[in-house]
Amino acid sequence: MTEYIIETKDLTKRFGKDVAVNSVNMKIERGQIYGLLGRNGAGKTTTMCMLLNLSKPSSGEINLFGEDYRKHPKENYSKIGSIIETPGFYENLNAVENLKIIAKLRGNYNRKTIDEVLNLVCLYDAKYKKFKDFSLGMKQRLGIAAAIMHSPELLIL
């Protein structure tokens, strides 16, 4: 039997009378790349927020790594890296300082790892530049660095 990294059954999200996500069923296998496509307002971001436990489903099931996401939320979500539409970096801190905060919150601060991910996303030479002075592309790459810094099993972009 295949163990899915993500599996949803009839995942639904309502905001009052409005249905933002209606009975989404998906099965995502480990090592695969999937895309969630749709028009504006189709519920893509809402679905991602439910998968990341940032928003609770109105009904339906979410299984992560083969079990109900509510059973071991801290354990399961430590295996996930994500990039949300507006990353929450501190404007007056540089790239290293911002990543250091994230690493410490996750309990895995390692300066060498920070340097490695900054190099990987081509921000090593800008590591002491303040976030507010980054271009949009640099901000997005810092978001990628933050998402991959702890070597997640699942990356949601």
Q: Where would I find each of the regions flagged by the language model?
A:
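Walker A (P-loop) phosphate-binding loop of ABC-type ATPase nucleotide-binding domains
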Residues: R39-G43
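Hydrophobic anchor residue at the start of the ABC signature
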Residues: I144
